[in-house]
Amino acid sequence: MSHSVKIYDTCIGCTQCVRACPLDVLEMVPWDGCKAGQIASSPRTEDCVGCKRCETACPTDFLSIRVYLGAETTRSMGLAY
């Protein structure tokens, strides 16, 4: 079972989710769509255990962890699939 980290458009670039993740699933990437100039991205979704610490840490309810069967992992925001 893998977990998909859905990233929505309310990221403020605070890095709280990145620091909260115990498995280093998230990272910040450059993005012009927010004031901070960076946005959370999830390049290592195969390592996500669904603990939801990133969701809890997020001050804007930006992240959502959803459980999928198989290798159905995605990154939203059009950054990659």
UniProtKB/Swiss-Prot annotation:
Any Pfam family: Fer4_7
The protein's location, in the record's own words, is:
Cellular thylakoid membrane
Q: What class of enzyme is it?
A: oxidoreductase
Cofactor note, please? Binds 2 [4Fe-4S] clusters. Cluster 2 is most probably the spectroscopically characterized electron acceptor FA and cluster 1 is most probably FB.
Reported impact of C58D = Unable to bind PSI cores (in vitro)
4Fe-4S ferredoxin-type domain segment(s): 2-31, 37-68
Q: Which GO terms describe its biological process?
A: photosynthetic electron transport in photosystem I
An annotated Gene Ontology molecular function: molecular adaptor activity
EC number from the UniProt entry: 1.97.1.12
Which co-factors does it depend on? [4Fe-4S] cluster
- InterPro entries cross-referenced by the UniProt entry: 4Fe4S_Fe-S-bd, 4Fe4S_Fe_S_CS, PSI_iron-sulfur_center, PSI_PsaC
| Record keywords | 4Fe-4S, Electron transport, Iron, Iron-sulfur, Membrane, Metal-binding, Oxidoreductase, Photosynthesis, Photosystem I, Repeat, Thylakoid, Transport
Binding positions for [4Fe-4S] cluster 2? C21, C48, C51, C54
> What topology in the membrane does the UniProt record assign?
Peripheral membrane protein
Which positions are annotated as binding [4Fe-4S] cluster 1? Answer: C11, C14, C17, C58
One GO cellular component term of this record is: photosystem I
- What reaction is this protein's catalytic activity? reduced [plastocyanin] + hnu + oxidized [2Fe-2S]-[ferredoxin] = oxidized [plastocyanin] + reduced [2Fe-2S]-[ferredoxin]
What result is annotated for mutating C51 to A/D/S? Answer: Generates altered FA cluster (in vitro)
UniProt xrefs under HAMAP family:
PSI_PsaC
Oligomeric form and interacting partners: The cyanobacterial PSI reaction center is composed of one copy each of PsaA,B,C,D,E,F,I,J,K,L,M and X, and forms trimeric complexes.
Q: What does this protein do?
A: Apoprotein for the two 4Fe-4S centers FA and FB of photosystem I (PSI); essential for photochemical activity. FB is the terminal electron acceptor of PSI, donating electrons to ferredoxin. The C-terminus interacts with PsaA/B/D and helps assemble the protein into the PSI complex. Required for binding of PsaD and PsaE to PSI. PSI is a plastocyanin/cytochrome c6-ferredoxin oxidoreductase, converting photonic excitation into a charge separation, which transfers an electron from the donor P700 chlorophyll pair to the spectroscopically characterized acceptors A0, A1, FX, FA and FB in turn. Mutant proteins with a 3Fe-4S center are not observed bound to PSI in vitro, and are probably not able to do so in vivo.
Name of the protein: Photosystem I iron-sulfur center
Protein source organism: Picosynechococcus sp. (strain ATCC 27264 / PCC 7002 / PR-6)
